[in-house]
């Protein structure tokens, strides 16, 4: 098997704080914190104490950032092959893998200290479990082992609303699990759409994403099926009395639009449509949770 190339390291003097920030995948962490904050705000009537909002999200962000750093290290060789990732700090050699792992360890330790001392142990251990699930189980094993990597590993990425919820209540509750289920159902169509757009790169890197192993048509059909499942799952907060009419209208509108993208992708098999589907999926998730939050402060359960 031909070894994947690793770019030559650059001189240490070129390292900046921006390189370390990039290791933490700040955009991904920001989306996770958005869903965590919404989980906190949905957990109880009114607004949680400022200390829970501050320290809870700080701890979650630190541990999420640590998981992202480990991902950079584990995927170093893969990242050098893909155009989207070849300029990452570890892939280019700007930051050595051991330095990155040390940085991840510091972030994880700080995150655990913040959550245990300032929030509660349940949230701390659940967040750590998410880190291990993403950085260990998914990145080290599932990503390279099965085309169902996203489906199985998606649970780790779906945890932030539950973490926010437990930060406020100190316990796992059914409505919090509904939020996890929504993100869990959203994950496959989100990543498979990107995988269709980047199919050649994933194949070159040896990652068995569904379009690589089973083809575009099979993947597009499964995107449609998961989008239908997501539409159904997204209505559960209304069905269970967690939310009201505002959320129902918003969830239907957003979900039907997502379904339209999925149908268009299945009919056209176009890389541009796949990319647009991927982009819309991000808008969908953010908008859905914002609508759920707005509904929470307007709707009063009977």
UniProtKB/Swiss-Prot annotation:
The chain crosses the membrane at residues 28-48, 50-70, 95-115, 122-142, 150-170, 176-196, 221-241, 243-263, 282-302. Pathway: Porphyrin-containing compound metabolism; heme O biosynthesis; heme O from protoheme: step 1/1. Its EC number is 2.5.1.141. It catalyses: heme b + (2E,6E)-farnesyl diphosphate + H2O = Fe(II)-heme o + diphosphate. PROSITE patterns: UBIA. The keyword Transport does not apply. Pfam families: UbiA. It is found in: Cell inner membrane. Its main location: membrane. GO terms for biological process: heme O biosynthetic process. It is a multi-pass membrane protein. It is an enzyme of class 2 (transferase). GO terms for molecular function: protoheme IX farnesyltransferase activity. One of its GO terms (cellular component) is plasma membrane. Keywords: Cell inner membrane, Cell membrane, Heme biosynthesis, Membrane, Transferase, Transmembrane, Transmembrane helix. Carbon 2 of the heme B porphyrin ring is defined according to the Fischer nomenclature. Converts heme B (protoheme IX) to heme O by substitution of the vinyl group on carbon 2 of heme B porphyrin ring with a hydroxyethyl farnesyl side group. Belongs to the UbiA prenyltransferase family. Protoheme IX farnesyltransferase subfamily. This is Protoheme IX farnesyltransferase. It comes from Marinobacter nauticus (strain ATCC 700491 / DSM 11845 / VT8) (Marinobacter aquaeolei).
């Amino acid at each position: 098997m031909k070894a994947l190339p690793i770019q030559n390291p650059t001189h240490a003097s070129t390292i900046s704080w921006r390189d370390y920030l990039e290791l933490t995948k700040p955009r991904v962490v920001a989306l996770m914190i958005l869903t965590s904050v919404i989980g906190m705000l949905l957990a109880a009537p009114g607004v949680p104490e400022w200390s829970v909002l501050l320290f809870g999200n700080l701890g979650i962000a630190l541990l999420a950032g640590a998981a992202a750093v480990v991902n950079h290290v584990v995927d170093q060789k893969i990242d050098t092959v893909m155009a989207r990732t070849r300029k990452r700090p570890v892939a280019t050699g700007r930051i050595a893998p051991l330095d990155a792992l040390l940085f991840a360890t510091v972030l994880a330790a700080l995150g655990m200290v913040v959550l245990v001392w300032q929030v509660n142990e349940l949230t701390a251990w659940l967040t750590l479990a998410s880190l291990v699930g993403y950085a260990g189980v998914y990145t080290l094993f599932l990503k390279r082992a099965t085309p169902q990597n996203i489906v199985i590993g998606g649970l780790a990425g779906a945890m932030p609303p539950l973490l926010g919820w437990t930060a406020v209540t100190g316990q796992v509750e059914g409505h919090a699990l509904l939020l996890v289920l929504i993100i869990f159902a959203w994950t496959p169509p989100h990543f498979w759409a990107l995988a269709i757009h980047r199919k050649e790169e994933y194949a070159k890197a040896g990652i068995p994403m569904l379009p690589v192993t089973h083809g575009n048509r099979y993947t597009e059909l499964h995107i449609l099926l998961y989008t239908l499942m997501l539409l159904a799952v997204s209505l559960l907060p209304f069905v269970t009395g967690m939310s009201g009419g505002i959320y129902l209208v918003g969830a239907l509108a957003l979900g039907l639009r997502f379904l339209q993208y999925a149908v268009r992708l299945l009919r056209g098999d176009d890389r541009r449509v796949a990319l647009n589907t991927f982009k819309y999926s991000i808008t969908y998730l953010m908008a859905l949770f914002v609508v759920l939050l707005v509904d929470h402060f307007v709707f009063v359960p009977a």
